[in-house]
Amino acid sequence: MQKGIKVNLALIIVFILSVLVLFINNLTTPRTLSNQELLVNGLFLFQEPKEISDFSFESSNKEIFTKNNLMGKWSVIYFGFSRCPDECPVAMYELSKLAKVLREKDFYMDDKQWILITIDPERDTPETIDKYAKGFDSEFIGLSSSRPMLLNLATQLAVNNSMPPMDNKEDNHEHLDDHVNNIILVNPKGEFVGFFRPPFDISRLSLTYQSVTQSD
């Protein structure tokens, strides 16, 4: 009789622990949002991903970055420039907070990368833009290239960068200030899947980013 009670008690304890584990897992596992929920929270996803043609950019230490570097990873891409007075540092700061929050949550990051592409290649050398990007997070990558290469990729990613090159005035960046401020999302197949729209908020960025990029 006493043995039966112990067995039943053990089964009850196992059941309670199982329920507790499932409850905690539901709390910690990011919820998969519908496309409408994603849109309400600032992430627009295309019905079908868009192909990206090959490109070639350069980071510091003459490291070449091509479409091949997008394969196998979720890539967040932002177009900005190191002398940007307002929008760029705000967006980059929010992305740095997002990366920090994800690490603190032990979110799987091995297949994630964060890229800043300069829209001012005449002044932002690969070393300059990479240093600027890493000023927000040491894992961020800064890239520069020729203006034709920049415009080709920017057009594919729906970023309006059809502006003339910088002139010789050191502090003149007015024609760059109206650039599209979206944050681009590229999937591990190297396809353009959508974009985050401003204003950027860490809670919404974290919610939508985790929903779309969480590993199985």
Each predicted region: which residue ranges?
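N-terminal targeting signals for export/organelle localization
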Residues: 1-54, 215-216
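Thiol-/selenol-based redox modules, centered on thioredoxin-like
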Residues: 168-216
